[in-house]
């Protein structure tokens, strides 16, 4: 389990849960801190059968661990929502820890209004053909929709790095218009990196996922969110 935190101090305590407010937030004039929890079976999972690191993380992923993190977040941010991202393996793993986590996350979606989505493991665009990345994103979205039920559908993808073609596919084929698709500060470390990009949200160009669109002719209607943004 990997949690991406910015600006929060989490304390274990009984959560104080207010009624979930599902009204859309106004972007203009506001600032936001996002918290995402990634559920995976190994580091740097690119696909079911493409894993860049062999370590099995099942013992790191427990119901007790994710519950403590979610409840600490609720205690300190009673109206806050967060995003859960599952790798394909984490969506399908039949072991007890992952089954319990999936069931709990479905409860959190109903209780808090959390986003539940696909996390294709940081580096899919570097190790898989773009068509396969697109196909597996659609497959994962369908799995998640069935898992959560009640017509639920993810509104974002937690990508790590996704190509411009992948972002265009999300916008045009899946009607998803937000993706974490770049880590601007990461270059030539871990299992891959990028060439740099703006460190704040932007609409990408069809030419490259790190390039902001220059006009209508190269505009992709999927906001590219940097994963490691810092002021």
Where are these regions (language model features)?
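Bacterial N-terminal signal peptides
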Residues: 1-7
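Histidine-centered beta-alpha loop that forms part of the nucleotide-sugar donor binding/catalytic region
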Residues: 38, 121, 182-184
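Extracytoplasmic/secreted proteins, especially bacterial periplasmic and envelope-associated proteins
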Residues: 64-68, 135, 139, 143, ...
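Metal-dependent polysaccharide deacetylase catalytic core of the NodB/CE4 family, i.e.
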Residues: 79-162, 224, 229-231
């Amino acid at each position: 389990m990997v949690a991406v935190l910015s600006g929060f101090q989490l304390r274990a305590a009984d959560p104080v849960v207010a009624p979930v407010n599902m009204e859309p937030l106004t972007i203009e004039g506001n600032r936001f801190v996002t918290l995402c929890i990634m559920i995976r079976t190994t580091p740097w999972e690119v696909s079911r059968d493409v894993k860049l690191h062999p370590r099995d993380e099942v013992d790191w992923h427990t119901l007790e661990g994710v519950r403590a993190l979610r409840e600490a977040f609720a205690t300190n941010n009673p109206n806050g929502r967060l995003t859960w991202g599952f790798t394909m393996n984490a969506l399908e793993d039949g072991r007890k820890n992952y089954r319990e986590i999936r069931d709990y996350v479905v409860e959190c979606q109903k209780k808090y209004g959390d986003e539940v989505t696909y996390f294709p493991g940081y580096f899919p665009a570097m190790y898989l053909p773009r068509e396969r990345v697109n196909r597996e994103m659609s497959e994962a979205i369908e799995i998640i929709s069935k898992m959560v039920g009640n017509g639920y559908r993810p509104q974002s993808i937690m990508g790590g790095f996704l190509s411009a073609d992948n972002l265009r596919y999300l916008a045009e084929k899946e009607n998803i218009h937000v993706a974490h698709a770049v880590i601007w500060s990461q270059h030539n470390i871990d299992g891959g990196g990028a060439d740099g990009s703006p460190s704040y949200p932007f609409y990408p160009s069809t030419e490259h996922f790190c390039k902001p669109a220059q006009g209508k002719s190269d505009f992709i209607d999927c906001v590219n969110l940097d994963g490691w943004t810092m002021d």
